[in-house]
Amino acid sequence: MARNAEKAMTALARFRQAQLEEGKVKERRPFLASECTELPKAEKWRRQIIGEISKKVAQIQNAGLGEFRIRDLNDEINKLLREKGHWEVRIKELGGPDYGKVGPKMLDHEGKEVPGNRGYKYFGAAKDLPGVRELFEKEPLPPPRKTRAELMKAIDFEYYGYLDEDDGVIVPLEQEYEKKLRAELVEKWKAEREARLARGEKEEEEEEEEEINIYAVTEEESDEEGSQEKGGDDSQQKFIAHVPVPSQQEIEEALVRRKKMELLQKYASETLQAQSEEARRLLGY
């Protein structure tokens, strides 16, 4: 096939083709597909476009053409593909077959379509151009997301801050901050002391007297304390050492007697109650 294509491109072959076409009026393909009103001509122009696409696809396979020539050929092929689609729509409008459904799929043979790039395709050596190869590389899968249990397994003392002092950085900083804070407190105490001295000796004497008499006890307080001690002694004298506690049997007998009295008061007459009381008294109960 390559040998036949080379023969067709020789000067003799082109001269012979020009001789055969002399005297014929070469019909030019309409710029717009909508200008064609005949179905056979629309089919003819579609076949012509497919032939041009095939020639350019064969040329673009040669990687030695150079980057700019390969890009131009790829643009021309995409332009012809769009034009072919217009003629297929026009053929369908004129009552012809729907090549969009019944036509062969050309993506696998003619080029790869970049997703989201409005149908622009790359053919032959154009797939290996700088910046194009990366478009067809698959993105690496994101790392699997760890569950909460897996994250908790990796938690140690360092997570809670127990090892912060081992880095040798935080301890010197804390010591420096502590020195600074102590110096500030000392300066504050000195300023307060100087302010107290500036107020006068009288206030100092009053403060000293208050400090001296802070543990002084008045007569009223001493009397109250004495009365409390006496009261404590009286309470100790009145304390009863032993209180007899009734046994379980004595409690049951008392309950039985109480129940009997309630029944007698409820059902017996006054005369019968008086007789029973007298009998109990005589018997010694």
From Swiss-Prot:
Lineage: Eukaryota, Metazoa, Chordata, Craniata, Vertebrata
Protein's UniProt name: Pre-mRNA-splicing factor ISY1 homolog
Nuclease as UniProt keyword: no
The species this protein was found in: Homo sapiens
Biological processes per GO annotation: generation of catalytic spliceosome for second transesterification step; mRNA 3'-splice site recognition; mRNA splicing, via spliceosome
TM region(s), chain numbering: none
Modified residues (N6-acetyllysine): K127
Protein localization: Nucleus
Family classification: Belongs to the ISY1 family.
Keywords: Acetylation, mRNA processing, mRNA splicing, Nucleus, Phosphoprotein, Spliceosome
